[in-house]
């Protein structure tokens, strides 16, 4: 019987490493024993955790700063212990958070054009963990809300605008937390921990909504992330040390929707998820490949697409947000693969013959504008990401400076009702420069359209005149 091949526009996703001159060379990537990605990327900068004497440090390079990186290049170096995790703010491309073995979280403001001097003073230091902080994750839709998780088995959610810890989940995990993931609107988090449990938690109600014991039975680390439809995707190991991936419905976590066994490598599988295309990319630490799968509503739900393979193993991996991709090249993902001494971008494309904008590859995607202010989220409001179109390419706007306003310690009013100054001016205040830039951009786009229309009309006219000339000549 002839087998029917499943139709998918992503069956031919093609991975390609960039040329050597477009890599970031001579970087001493961190050797610390921790299963984070060691790299964070946005449309302006790539940040990489590096080896540093006398404390912890990471590099922040403008994307165009390729080639050999000088040993004296400025670093972000305020931590007194190794940096374990970094995460760019989704609402401000110049703000990055870092977690360290020194038990602190620091939030940094990077100058618009990158560093010219090493940065030692963070905008704010967040102190609340009693052991090293291995996870930092910004809220996807609320401005200034940052989550951190430490080896004290506690999750703290901060209002960065005031430097306050407003939620402390310190009694939900009996063992080390491997990772934490926000859902699409930031109302829930899911966690994977060393006790082999996957938990879905409502952080504001401080209660566990769903829980699965022994999601994967192996002893090695697991990962759990939320998908756009609310399901949870996990990676882990079987009792026989085979790597597994699984899909779960939080409303019924007795049995997985899908469970696949992959291979017997021992590297932790780091999942990177694109909610616009429903593709999950799995990058194993120590692997030399990236496997990718499409998640659909039809059995077997998790469909293997392809594998990008290279020669060198990866020490870590950065993943570019959708708004940083080149839509003209039909690029659907860009990874920043960390080698021992360099960072190598890898571009994933869907080959298309047409030069037109591919609407089916690029639905409206999460933009840089926050949907909520911090105090709105802490008061119980939820909002989906504010979407933008990539049809004309994404042009980064000017970011506002991060400002932190400390509360008066003597002020004893409940924190939940207090108003606070935030990283950016509230939405109601219009950024004049930004509006002017948008108006100019609209004018330019209208002018281009007008020129295109004129050219089309001229082409038609020339064609008619040529036909008339041909008749006369005949």
Swiss-Prot record:
A GO molecular-function annotation: small GTPase binding
Record Pfam families: DUF1899, WD40, WD40_4
UniProt WD repeat ranges: 25-70, 78-118, 128-168, 172-202, 215-249, 263-303
Gene3D superfamilies, per database record: YVTN repeat-like/Quinoprotein amine dehydrogenase
Source species, domain of life: Eukaryota
Tissues where this protein is expressed: Ubiquitous.
Coiled coil location: 436-474
A single GO BP: signal transduction
GO cellular component, one term: ruffle membrane
Disulfide cross-links: none
Membrane topology summary: Peripheral membrane protein
UniProt-annotated location(s): Cell membrane; Cell projection, Lamellipodium; Cell projection, Ruffle membrane; Cytoplasm, Cytoskeleton
Keywords recorded for this protein, A-Z: Acetylation, Actin-binding, Cell membrane, Cell projection, Coiled coil, Cytoplasm, Cytoskeleton, Endosome, Membrane, Repeat, Synapse, WD repeat
Modified residues (N6-acetyllysine): 446
Stated family: Belongs to the WD repeat coronin family.
Subunit structure: Binds F-actin. Interacts with RCC2. Interacts preferentially with nucleotide-free and GDP-bound RAC1. Interacts with VIM (via head domain). Isoform 1 and isoform 2 appear as homotrimers, while isoform 3 seems to exist as monomers. Interacts with MICAL2; this interaction recruits MICAL2 to the actin filaments.
UniProt comment concerning the protein's domains: The C-terminal coiled-coil domain is essential for cortical membrane localization and oligomerization.
UniProt function note: Plays a role in directed cell migration by regulating the activation and subcellular location of RAC1. Increases the presence of activated RAC1 at the leading edge of migrating cells. Required for normal organization of the cytoskeleton, including the actin cytoskeleton, microtubules and the vimentin intermediate filaments. Plays a role in endoplasmic reticulum-associated endosome fission: localizes to endosome membrane tubules and promotes recruitment of TMCC1, leading to recruitment of the endoplasmic reticulum to endosome tubules for fission.
Protein name: Coronin-1C
